[in-house]
Structure formats: C-alpha cells, structure tokens
C-alpha cells in the first residue's frame, strides 16, 4: 500500500511531508528546498513551469506568471472577499490577467489559455506529488491537504477538485491550525490548552484547542480568509508607488513589469526588516521617460513598516477575542501560543500576540513546516501508522433552516465538533400543502433574511392533510472535511430529497464579523422580532384549532360558549392585524381559557352517557408531540 502524503497548499509557499519510521519528514523539492513557491507560469516557449523556477522568471514574464491563486479558490466574480474587496479589485492588483468565466467563475490567463483556480492549484500539487515520488521512489496517489479553518464549502470543494485534477485522492481536508496543533502536541504528555495563531501568506486563522492523552479537541476557531502576508506586501508596494510618484511624477502602478519588481522588492524588504532596523530598496531601470532610464532607491525603516501595517496586525486580534469568548477560556488559561505561518516572524506580530495573550509565544516549531507536518501525521492516523491520536475539529458557523415567519431555526450551532449529524421534525404551514421548500442557512442571526443562503431544494409528493399533520424530518450531516449535506424526508410516505452543499458562496471573515457585530448590536431588536413572530404563530395556530373545534363540535357546544368562542377568535384575528405583541398575547390567553371551557363542556356531555375512560397520561401526550416544530415551507 502506497504512502499517503500531507500537503500544506499555501498562498505563498507549499510543502509536502510524509511519515517515515514513525516520524513526520518534510520532503525537499527537486531544487533542494522544502519550501516550494506557489507560483505557476507559462514561459515564452509555451512550457509550464512551477515553483522556484516560475518565481525566478516572474519579472521577465509578469503577465504569464500566476501567484496567490489560493485567494481565488472557490470564489465568484462579483462576490465580496475581505473588507469590501471584490474579486475584480483583487484582480487589478495582479500583473497577470484575471477574467470572468461562465457562471461568474474566476479564470486566470497564462499564454493563450485561461484556467480555473483549481487547475492552477493542481499544477502546484502535481509538482509536490512529483517531488514526493522522486524522494520516496514510489507512486503517490493519496493525500491529506490543509485549508484555512475559515474556508467555506466552495473553497474546500475547490481544493478537493485541485487534488483530483493532480491525480490525488484527497482522503481528508484538515484545517491548518489543527494540523499545526497535531505537529506541536504529538509527543506532549501533559494536558494543556493551546492557541494556534496562524498568519500565512493569504489567510489568517486562530484556534483554541485542548490537548490531552492523544486527543486534540478544537474548542473554537475564528479567522479571516483575506488577511495575510500578501496584504503586508501590498502596503509596501502602495507606499513605494506613492513615494515614487511624489518624487518622479511617474505612476508605476500602470507598468506590469515594474509591479512585479515592486512585489519582489517589498517581500524581500519585509523579510529583512524582521532582523534589521532599516533596509535599502534599490531597483535600477525601474522605468523610463523622455529623459532616459529611471531608478528607484528608497530607505525603509522597521518603524515605518510597522506604522504601515499596524492596522493589519490589529485586525488579526479581533478573531482572537472571538475565539477566546467562544471557547469559554481566558487568555490566562492558555498554556501555550503557537505561531504558524511565515508572517509571524515579524517582530511586531510577535509583540502584539504576546501583549494579547500575556505570555511569550512558543517558538519551538518551524512556522513554515508545522502545517505540512501535521497533515502528514493525520495521513499517518488514517493509514494506521500513527495510533492513539484522536482529532476533533469544529464548524465555524451555525447551520439551520427557515421556519414559520422567516425565523432561522438552528440545527447545528457554530463550534460543534465534526463529523456530526442532527435531525429535527418540522411540519407544513397550510392545509393540503403538496410540497415544501427546504431553505438551508448559515449564520448567527435569529431571522432567516439576516443570514446567508447555502442552498434550497424541494420535497414533493406530500399527501393532502391539515397543516401541522405531515411530519417532515430534516437531517443535517457534516463530514470530517466540514462539508454539509441536507436531507428532507416525509415520514408518512417515505419520500425524501437531499442536497450536498458544495458550491455555496460562503463567507469572508469580514462578513462573519459583521454578522456577529450586528447580532450583538441588534440583540434586543432581534429578540423582540422573534418574540412577536412566535406570539403570532401561537395565536394563529390556536385560532385555527378553535375554528376547527367549532366546526367539528357545533352540536355539542352550548350556545353561550359557542358565542364566546367566536368572540375570542375574532379578538385574536383582530389583534393579529396589528403590531401590539401584548394584545396578541392577551387575546391568545383569553381564547385558550375559552377553549378549555368548551373542552370541559364537550367531555362533560360525553361522560354523562358513557363509562369513564382513562385519560392519556401527560407523558404520553408529550411523547406524541415531542420533536415536532411547525415550519413554514413555500406552497407550490
């Protein structure tokens, strides 16, 4: 049986690792480095090149050299990414061409062809696969691939697609901070709580985990799929462009070759400023005008760089606050803070993390290699090479469906351990309703309209029946990859329908933060709206039952009670026309009391001419009703 490799498919760099002799080993590339640039190009001869070779020729071939493709994985043209940054705006920063394909898909152009992001990622994976096969001396067909914890379903599916295109069966998609925790904690004997702060080239994740006796349990996770080293580089690039325009009057942002040179210079300067206080950015012949060639020569200090990127570092701390809150932990309860990702080498990042958690971050792991090592360990677990390790990951957002009145009814709450399955029984909202629409939602708000739609599907063939009678069982299943499937089943007919959510547009970190902030800011308003809808549902249902009771028992109800019940029903219907929740509750209570009187009168008449019968127990009644929630589904 062949080896299963662990792959860290990064925005800036990628790595591949494998278990050998019970230990994880990072595999060097054909060029001798364990870090393989996530860069793909087609050169002037039409040859496809990947990795270090592609990066080295980027300045001479900027339009046909693609990097940071991970930021376009699972994305749609026109869809927001990050803080009000649509794909189009992100594309404008790249020297290569990004175009709109069918169904608003993102495509990138190299040579005379255009490619989807999974295709480009597959080229990187093929390079990793080839290097691993050369190192191991055998074919590699299976892999565990890491993704940011906050990757949505579409992004995870795009990653699996890339693996398939590269000829790899992806046995598991594993979250990057969780992989890092595996690498850190594999040989640890004591129980501890750790925070994994993962700031990579394009994404940011923070996870809180509990480690003990071989179990790695994620307590909470938060992050931003559009925050990373690329953004730090862009700050320097923007500054260089502005300074040069101020000094020379020339706008370098319009020159693709100059842009590529600026990107490389920015990345180099940023890395140097992690160990020195200032660096000189020297780019001869950056451009030319009528007077001749122009050069760029600027001094950048660490202090200036820190001023430029302070907002980005601060931006990473809000998810840390959210993760701590969701985990129920305080910073004092965190035993170790693990730094992951090359951007965490920046002194400012390390200082801010230290200030936030109140302790020195653990620097005992290689931030570039730890994720690939964790992926290899998970591969070893799946193949039985690593024993006594249990990994328990979570979902980042609440999942549910829309029910009566536009309410979002949660089935699986955020930070629930996966894999998991949850079922709940709902019913129809109208008499003789022949079909229902299942509206699958993602988000923390009480109202469906305030959450994100993941998908919709129909369940047809429901037999004619009064509302509330059909039993529709809705089941949510989330697999170990964090991918969701939803099934609806009519318990009466056995008819069922299901959908796998693999192409949802998902959420950026900013959207999640916005949802959370709105949920807190509008908590009182949301509660009031939800109470009103619940009160309306109870009132409408009671009035419906009262009207049915009148129709079915007209000859058994005394005239005075009949008149009183009609009056109370009318009062409820009138209250439902207005917006006074207290009036709705008051008339509902009065109708309930009147309905009880009618019931007593009807049963009293029956008992006069018949032997007493044992009344069903309260427990029996509860058992009959338990688990049924009235749901609103669209009538077709």
UniProtKB/Swiss-Prot annotation:
Keywords: ATP-binding, Chaperone, Nucleotide-binding, Phosphoprotein, Stress response. The modification Phosphothreonine is found at residue 203. The keyword ATP-binding applies. One of its GO terms (molecular function) is ATP binding. SUPFAM superfamilies: Actin-like ATPase domain, Heat shock protein 70kD (HSP70), peptide-binding domain. Residues 602-636 are annotated as: Disordered. PROSITE patterns: HSP70_1, HSP70_2, HSP70_3. Residues 618-636 have a biased composition (Basic and acidic residues). Induction: By stress conditions e.g. heat shock. The keyword Kinase does not apply. It comes from the Bacteria. Belongs to the heat shock protein 70 family. Acts as a chaperone. This is Chaperone protein DnaK. It comes from Dehalococcoides mccartyi (strain ATCC BAA-2100 / JCM 16839 / KCTC 5957 / BAV1).
């Amino acid at each position: 049986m062949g080896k299963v490799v662990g792959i860290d498919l990064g925005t800036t760099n990628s790595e591949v690792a494998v278990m050998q002799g019970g230990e994880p080993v990072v595999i060097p590339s054909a060029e001798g480095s364990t870090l393989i640039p996530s860069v793909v190009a087609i050169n002037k001869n039409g040859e496809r090149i990947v990795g270090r070779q592609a990066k080295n020729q980027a300045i001479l071939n900027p339009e046909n050299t693609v990097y940071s493709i991970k930021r376009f994985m699972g994305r749609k043209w026109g869809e927001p990414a990050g803080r009000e940054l649509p794909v189009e705006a992100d594309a404008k920063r790249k020297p290569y061409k990004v175009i709109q394909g069918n169904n608003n898909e993102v495509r990138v152009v190299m040579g005379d062809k255009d490619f989807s992001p999974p295709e480009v990622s597959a080229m990187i994976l093929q390079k990793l696969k080839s290097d691993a096969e050369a190192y191991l001396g055998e074919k590699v067909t299976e892999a565990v691939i890491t993704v940011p914890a906050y990757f949505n379903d579409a992004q995870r599916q795009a990653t699996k697609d890339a693996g398939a295109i590269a000829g790899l069966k992806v046995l598991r998609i594993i979250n990057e901070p969780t992989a890092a925790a595996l690498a850190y904690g594999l040989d640890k004997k004591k129980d501890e709580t750790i925070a994994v702060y993962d700031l990579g080239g394009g994404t940011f994740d923070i996870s809180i985990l509990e480690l003990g006796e071989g179990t790695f349990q994620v307590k909470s996770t938060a992050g931003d799929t559009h925050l990373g080293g690329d953004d730090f580089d862009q700050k320097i690039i923007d500054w260089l462009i502005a300074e040069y325009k101020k000094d020379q009057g020339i706008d370098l942002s319009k020159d693709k070759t100059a842009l590529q040179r600026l990107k490389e210079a920015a990345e180099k300067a940023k890395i140097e400023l992690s160990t020195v206080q200032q660096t000189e950015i020297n780019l001869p012949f950056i451009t030319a005008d009528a007077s001749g060639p122009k050069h760029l020569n600027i001094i950048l200090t660490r202090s200036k760089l820190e001023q430029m990127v302070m907002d980005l570092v601060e931006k990473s701390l809000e998810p840390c606050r959210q993760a701590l809150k969701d985990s129920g932990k305080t910073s004092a309860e965190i035993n170790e803070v693990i730094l992951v990702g090359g951007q965490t080498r920046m002194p400012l990042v390390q200082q801010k993390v230290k200030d936030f958690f109140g302790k020195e971050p653990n620097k005992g792991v290689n931030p570039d290699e730890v994720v690939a090592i964790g992926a290899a360990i998970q591969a070893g677990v799946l193949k039985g090479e690593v024993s006594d390790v249990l990994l328990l990951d979570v979902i980042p957002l609440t999942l549910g469906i829309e029910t009566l009145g536009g309410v979002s009814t949660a089935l699986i709450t955020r930070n629930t351990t996966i894999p998991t399955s949850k079922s709940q029984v709902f019913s129809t909202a109208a008499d003789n309703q022949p079909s229902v629409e299942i509206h699958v939602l993602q988000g923390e708000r009480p109202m469906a309209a305030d959450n994100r739609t993941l998908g919709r599907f129909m369940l047809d063939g429901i037999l004619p029946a009064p509302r509330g009678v059909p039993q529709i069982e809705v089941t949510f299943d989330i697999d170990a990859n964090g991918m969701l499937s939803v099934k609806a089943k009519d318990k009466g007919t056995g008819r069922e329908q299901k959908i796998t959510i693999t192409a949802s547009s998902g959420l950026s970190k900013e959207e999640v933060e916005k949802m959370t902030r709105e949920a807190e800011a509008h908590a009182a308003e949301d509660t009031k709206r939800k109470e009103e809808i619940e009160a309306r549902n109870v009132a409408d249902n009671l009035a419906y039952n009262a009207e049915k009771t009148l129709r079915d028992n007209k000859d058994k109800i005394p005239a005075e009670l009949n008149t009183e019940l009609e009056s109370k029903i009318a009062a409820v219907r009138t209250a439902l026309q207005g917006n006074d929740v207290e009036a709705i509750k008051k008339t509902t209570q009065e109708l309930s009391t009147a309905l009880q009187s009618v019931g007593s009168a009807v049963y009293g008449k029956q008992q006069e001419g018949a032997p007493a019968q044992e009344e069903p127990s309260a427990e029996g009644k509860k058992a009959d009703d338990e688990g049924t929630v009235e749901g609103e589904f669209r009538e077709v």
